[in-house]
């Protein structure tokens, strides 16, 4: 048995750890077409690695993370190439590609993760910007009108890329805002790869985001289990809500009567 002084032993451990770090799969080395696809966002990367650290010992974490990275690249190798890359606002934090990254994590770590954990990951990506907008009150006509204009602007972006096919109903004073998607790349991806079971965890954030604006989302169907994803949005004090109580269906979707 060879005995090393503690200082020499610490140096050896540090060098070994450094070698392990050098063996990490770098994001820049992932093989996918970056002319049409984008890498998952840094916040998404942080979320996934945090969950891996929660479930796996330190000696396994880099291996698991590399599996997630490779699965992401594999998915993109057989995925549509017309989503606009970095130019499309839907491909930012919490958007289409982050959803694909989370689904990559789910396929690799399905044995240890949970529905609520996936739901939480998407919330942590989407909700921070809505928390900064807590001063918005959808019960007030002015804010409701400004929200409507924001949805109309979003539709123009959708019309440019034809990723989320969006229709916005005309604005009516005193009535809820309504718009719908008849196409959703995230839902399309989940259907293609047999991952629809986890889509409710990614879709439910829409309800949580509206609640931060003193608003309520009323939804009856999604592109995952129907032909559209509907958004009826009103203030959280609107009498309209009494006729549309919220519930969770068997799949885990938050929806309304």
Which residue ranges define each predicted feature?
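Short, cationic low-complexity segments
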Residues: 208, 246-257
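Short, hydrophobic/π-rich interface segment
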Residues: 167-225
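Short, charged/polar, Gly/Pro-enriched secondary-structure boundary elements
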Residues: 186-188, 236-243
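C-terminal edge-of-domain segments
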Residues: 226-235
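Short, Lys/Arg-enriched N-terminal segments with co-localized hydrophobic residues
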Residues: 8-24
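N-terminal, charged low-complexity regulatory/assembly segments
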Residues: 26-106
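Amphipathic interaction/junction segments at domain boundaries or subunit interfaces
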Residues: 97-192
């Amino acid at each position: 048995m060879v005995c090393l002084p503690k200082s020499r032993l610490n140096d050896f451990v540090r060098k070994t750890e450094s070698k392990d770090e050098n063996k990490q799969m770098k994001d820049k080395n992932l093989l996918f077409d970056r002319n049409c696809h984008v890498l998952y966002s840094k916040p998404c990367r942080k979320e996934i690695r945090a969950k891996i650290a929660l479930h796996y010992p330190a000696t396994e974490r880099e291996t698991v993370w590399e599996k997630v990275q490779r699965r992401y690249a594999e998915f993109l190798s057989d995925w549509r190439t017309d989503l606009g890359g970095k130019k499309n606002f839907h491909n930012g934090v919490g958007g289409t590609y982050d959803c694909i990254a989370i689904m990559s994590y789910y396929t690799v770590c399905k044995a240890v993760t949970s529905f609520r954990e996936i739901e939480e990951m998407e919330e942590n990506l989407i909700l921070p910007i809505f928390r900064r907008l807590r001063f918005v009150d959808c019960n007030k006509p002015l804010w409701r009108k400004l929200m409507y204009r924001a949805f109309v602007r979003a539709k123009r972006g959708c019309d440019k890329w034809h990723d989320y096919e969006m229709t916005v109903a005309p604005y009516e004073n005193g009535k809820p805002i309504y718009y719908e998607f008849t196409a959703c790349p995230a839902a399309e991806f989940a259907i293609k790869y047999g991952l629809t079971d986890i889509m409710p965890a990614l879709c439910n954030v829409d309800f949580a985001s509206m609640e931060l604006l003193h608003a309520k989302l009323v939804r009856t169907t999604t592109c995952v289990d129907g032909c559209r994803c509907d958004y009826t949005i009103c203030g959280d004090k609107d009498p309209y809500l009494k006729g549309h109580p919220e519930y969770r269906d068997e799949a885990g979707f938050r929806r309304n009567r």
